């Protein structure tokens, strides 16, 4: 393996570590799209934890960045925005953590990721992992749990009713990582009826096990299917993919003054159909708080702590559906291919070095 510098300027010790990185955008089918490399170990900044990574999960964000990002010449980008591991050292401003703590986190998109034996992560966006989960089970949760929580409670504000309409939420693309935890949070923390979409029998069965009240097919007319349910007009909609296709249907079926959230990246989006009903549109980008270092950056650590509590109480469950032993380039390429196909149910996790 070759030793190369980080793509982000950080202070390093002389210790090296195994990592998986890339130096040019390539398709997941190319054996050089991800490479086993060796890097200097990061040194924690004042607010940082230095974590020995035990397990990671792969998300659509990893696939998107790998496919389009070109690191600076001679440098490698390390992906990975889900991890669970053990704290090895803490920065001078860290409170509430110590060496030996078992933690989980998503991290920040503007820093090196978790495909490495050691990772420096801001302690304010991390939490102690659920005690009842192993590292692999815990690593499946952070990014999707944060995305789902922020969407439901910060963007859609589901605790604030839409006057005169059904307390129902339509979740487009329910069986993936984000959808799987969204269903659980709604079922556990609200009395909202959950309408989730799926197109395959295994996806429908998965959603019903998680707690969806109704499952409809996103390949057919959403307004017609929702009307046939006989539960009234939904107040909220959460679109996880292909929003440019579904937005006109969501505008038709949603209640006046309803709210729509999305997390994908449509090339163009015509929001004019929303005006006649005063429907609001909200983007959720989980990395906003750490990327912009917002005043409430610590809310992410608080959310993950609450999620861990709910897991340990048996009220939330890990969404891992496949675990691959060994964090290395070959296995990560395989996981990227699985995510790229777009038919994942739950999450794929890699554990151990």
Feature locations, PLM:
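C-terminal capping/lid region of NAD(P)-dependent oxidoreductase domains
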Residues: 12-15, 315-322, 333-353
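Glycine-rich beta-strand-centered segment in the early N-terminal region that forms part
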Residues: 40-57, 67-110
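Residue-level marker of beta-strand positions
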Residues: 101-102, 118, 259
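A structural motif shared across PLP-dependent enzymes of the aminotransferase-like
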Residues: 110-123
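Short, glycine/polar-rich helix-capping loops at beta-to-alpha or helix-loop-helix junctions
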Residues: 114-115, 198-206, 268-271
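Mid-domain Rossmann-like dinucleotide-binding core that forms the NAD(H)/NADP(H) cofactor-binding site
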Residues: 141-220
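Glycine-rich cofactor phosphate-binding loops and adjacent beta1-alpha1 units
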Residues: 160-162, 214-284
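C-terminal substrate-binding/catalytic core of Rossmann-like NAD(P)-dependent dehydrogenases/reductases
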Residues: 273-323
């Amino acid at each position: 393996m070759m030793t190369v510098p980080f793509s982000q300027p950080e202070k390093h010790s002389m210790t090296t570590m195994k990592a998986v990185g890339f130096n040019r955008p390539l398709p997941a089918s190319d054996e050089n799209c991800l490479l086993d490399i060796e890097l200097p170990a990061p040194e924690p900044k004042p607010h940082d934890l230095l974590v020995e990574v035990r397990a990671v999960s792969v998300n659509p964000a990893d696939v998107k960045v790998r496919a389009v990002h070109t690191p600076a010449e001679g440098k490698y980008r390390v992906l990975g925005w889900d991890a669970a591991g053990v704290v090895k050292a803490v920065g001078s401003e860290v409170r509430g953590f110590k060496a030996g703590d078992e933690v989980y986190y998503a991290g920040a998109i503007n820093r090196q990721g978790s495909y490495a034996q050691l990772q420096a992560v801001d302690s304010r966006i991390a939490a102690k992992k659920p005690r009842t989960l192993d590292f692999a089970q815990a690593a499946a949760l952070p990014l999707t749990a944060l995305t789902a929580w922020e969407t439901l409670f910060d963007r859609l504000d589901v605790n604030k009713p839409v006057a005169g309409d059904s307390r129902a939420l339509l979740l487009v693309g329910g069986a993936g990582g984000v959808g799987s935890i969204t269903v659980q949070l709604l079922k556990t923390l609200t009395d909202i009826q959950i309408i989730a979409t799926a197109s395959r029998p295994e996806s429908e069965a998965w959603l019903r096990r998680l707690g969806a009240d109704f499952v409809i097919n996103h390949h057919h007319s959403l307004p017609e299917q929702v009307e046939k349910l006989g539960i009234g007009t939904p107040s909220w909609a959460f679109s996880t993919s292909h929003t440019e296709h579904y937005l006109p249907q969501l505008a038709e079926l949603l209640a006046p003054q309803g709210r729509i959230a999305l997390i994908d990246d449509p090339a163009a989006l015509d929001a004019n159909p929303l005006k006649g009903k005063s429907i609001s549109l909200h983007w959720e980008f989980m990395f906003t708080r750490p990327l912009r270092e917002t005043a409430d950056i610590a809310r992410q650590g608080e959310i993950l702590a609450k999620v861990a509590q709910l897991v340990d109480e048996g009220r939330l469950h890990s969404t891992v559906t496949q675990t691959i032993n060994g964090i290395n380039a070959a296995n990560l390429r395989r996981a990227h291919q699985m995510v790229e196909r777009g038919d994942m149910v739950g999450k794929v996790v890699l554990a151990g070095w």
